Design a protein with these regions (language model features):
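Extracellular glycoside hydrolase catalytic/binding regions
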Residues: 2-5, 19, 23-40, 44-170, ...
Length: 204
């Protein structure tokens, strides 16, 4: 009723080594929760230096398990910390209601990564930024306001859904809470973005 979605995520860097466990997990999750239309399945959060062919092969084994219970959106990670959506675009998965993961951190990643996204979309792929941060790719550092603005505008223009990293009180820049629970610099900024009050929120 409140427009909230839930992502059931296999949060790993090596899902291709645990296909059996992933099939069992997503089979049970899809059977139990797949009838809710606000549930999304992310079957491989962030492959590292894994060839796209291996990621695709893993996905082609897990997707049918979910589809036996649910037609909901399935999100598939891409190589190199879920950045190489261009490689997925050249050899996409033959399945319906699939999106591909694009991860970025505004302090590290810029136009070259958006160019990969533009290429993937030009080939017909749907993208979902299931992890992005306002800081550097190591999860730390100060908020890069200019870089975040560029990414927010690009995602808004291309109707790309996103999830910010992270709801955590770890002592690092990406956490939206400081240790102890007060909002961090990134947390304050994200709150302003979500409320549409930040000057960098394209939907304000």
């Amino acid at each position: 009723d409140r427009g909230i979605y839930v992502i059931i995520d296999w949060h790993t860097h090596g899902a291709q080594y645990n296909v059996g466990a992933a099939k069992d997990f997503f089979g049970r999750m899809a059977q139990k929760y797949g009838h809710y239309d606000n549930v999304i399945f992310e079957i491989y959060n962030e492959p590292l230096q894994v060839p796209w062919g291996e990621v695709k092969g893993y996905a082609e084994q897990v997707i049918p398990i979910i589809r036996s219970h649910s037609d909901n959106l399935i999100v598939v990670g891409t190589p190199t910390w879920s950045q190489d959506v261009d490689k997925a675009a050249n050899n996409p998965i033959n399945a319906h209601n699939i999106a591909y993961t694009l991860h970025f951190y505004a302090g590290t990643h810029g136009q070259y990564l958006r160019d990969k996204g533009n290429y993937a979309m030009s080939k017909g792929l749907a993208l979902f930024a299931t992890e992005w941060g306002t800081v550097n790719a190591n999860g730390d550092g100060g908020v890069n306001y200019g870089g975040t603005e560029e990414w927010l505008n690009w995602m808004d223009q291309n109707k790309i859904s996103w999830c910010n990293w992270s709801i955590h009180d770890k002592n690092e820049g990406a956490s939206i809470f400081n240790p102890g629970g007060s909002l961090s610099e990134s947390g304050k900024y994200l709150k302003d973005i979500l409320h549409g009050s930040a000057p960098y929120a394209p939907w304000r």
